[in-house]
Each structure stands twice: as C-alpha cells, then as structure tokens.
C-alpha cells in the first residue's frame, strides 16, 4: 500500500485549521467554523477507523511505516503504528469531534481560534502517537504544548478552576 495514511492523519487537522485561519471570524460565521472543524475531525476519525481495519493484528511489528530523510544522517521523518499506538490514535480522533460538539455555549469569545487550537493539538497528538524517530517525537510533543497552553491560558481561567475545586470539595464532604 503506497498511500501515506499516517501522514494524512497528521496533516488533515492542520489543513482544516489553515482553512479556519483564512476564513473570517464574524459572528454569523461561527456556526460555519464549527461545522468545518467538526467535518475535518470526523473525516480524520473515519480515516483512523479505516486504518484500524487495515491493521494486521497477527504481527507485533510496526505497520504503515513511512520513512523520509529530513536531515541526512541525523533526523528521519519516520512514522508507524503498532497495536498500542493505533488505539491512542483512534481515541484522539474520537475525542476531538466530541470536544468540538461540546463547545456550544462554553466558548463565547474567539471560537474560530479555539477550533484552530483544537485541530492543531489533534495534529500534534497524532504525530506523537505514531512517531518512530526520537527527534520527531520530541518536536511533536513539545509543539503540542503550545495549543494546549493557549487553550488553558485564553479559555480556561482561575474562576472556573475555583468553581471545579469547590464543587469537588462539596461532593467529597469537605
């Protein structure tokens, strides 16, 4: 099979994020942005399910390996999946549409940027789970912290953290 399915899984959310980046973020365009992000993440989910059906469970070797020379003799873009990483990829692509669906009223400002951050984070998470080169793993892992930091810093807050902790304390009988 010559189709680079893992690279497609990695790049598809980034393409959706680029599309959202170049669309205007007016109030009437928020629903369109959400549908574009949801469509992109659902296509990625079904692509990961397709990957699961193509996966040979009788072998423990890495499958769907793509190896490209990045810096000769130093770094290769090498991705592949085994029995554990494919489950994490499917889990990531399953949770992302749920996150996009669940932002109905919780994200009121900068919805477009929030959806871009979610899709970019999905890109980096899938890259982490299928990277076979240590440098590529490190780059995906560290780059994944950037959208996570933005999501927590912009849309998270001390007030909501305080509410969640006080609610947990009430439930525990403290």
Which stretches of residues belong to each language-model region?
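Transmembrane helix-loop-helix hairpins at membrane boundaries of multipass inner-membrane proteins
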Residues: 1-7, 19-116
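Hydrophobic alpha-helical membrane segments of integral membrane proteins
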Residues: 8-11, 36, 87, 127-148, ...
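Transmembrane alpha-helical core residues of multi-pass small-molecule transporters
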Residues: 12, 40-43, 95, 121, ...
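Alpha-helical transmembrane bundle and helix-membrane interface signal
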Residues: 104-111, 153-163
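Transmembrane-helix signature of multi-pass solute transporters
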Residues: 46, 124-127
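Alpha-helical transmembrane segments of multipass membrane proteins
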Residues: 17-21, 100, 126-127, 150
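Conserved small/polar residues in nucleotide/adenosyl-binding loops
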Residues: 164-169
